[in-house]
Amino acid sequence: NVIFSPRANLRFNPTQNINLRLSYSSGFRAPQAFDEDMHIENVGGTVAMIERAKNLKEEKSQSFSASADIYHRFGAFQTNFLIEGFYTKLTDVFVLGEPYNRGDGVLVKLRSNGPGAKVVGVTLEGKLAYLSLLQVQAGLTLQRSRYDEPHKWHDDVPAKRTIFRTPNVYGYFTATYIPIKPLSIALSGTYTCLLYTSDAA
């Protein structure tokens, strides 16, 4: 099938040091079993086959974002701050059903289309550079991911709107110090909050 996925961007610079941007994009994921599904099952010590439902359709997305990118210099220091808000609407979301034994000892999970979903959040990023000696960069994303209708991923837990294995908070940090060339000292790290498994939505 031919799928039309338009994209559009609009940028406005009210001053030389401020960039404002509006973006729209659409996309899709083809109906298939993904490597990450098998990886998740193997981590749990169990291998389950992923089968596609006969009427499985592609998962589609429409995304909107607005951002402000600000630059400023304080003497020998250069700074940059970015704030971006985003909203994504998903339709025909891929979901995996409860595993069942197909009769030959092999566990099978059925991939089907679930309810729609929404992801909304904000990203903050900052950069600081001092001459050519030091550069520091950090970012933080706060988001909320929810199904439009409660979804039950296991018979032992109640149906909930929370999308499983999606973080609400994640971020990163990098720093590079160059005291003398060619010596470079770097430090970096990432943060991801605990992923939802069984708490209330």
Where do the model's predicted regions map?
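Membrane-embedded beta-barrel scaffold of Gram-negative outer-membrane proteins
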Residues: N13, R21, N55-S112, K118
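Flexible, solvent-exposed coil segments and beta strand-coil junctions
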Residues: N1, M38-I50, E98-L107, P150-D156, ...
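Gram-negative outer-membrane beta-barrel transporters
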Residues: N80-L90, F94, V106-L195
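Signature of Gram-negative outer-membrane beta-barrel scaffolds
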Residues: N1-T15, A30, E41, H151-P158
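Membrane-spanning beta-strand positions in outer-membrane beta-barrel proteins
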Residues: N9, N13, N19-S23, Q78-N80, ...
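Conserved small/polar residues in nucleotide/adenosyl-binding loops
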Residues: Y196-A201
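Hydrophobic, lipid-facing positions within transmembrane beta-strands of outer-membrane proteins
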Residues: F4-L10, L20, R52, Q62-A66, ...
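Outer-membrane beta-barrel strand-turn architecture
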Residues: F4, F12-Q16, K60, I70-G75, ...
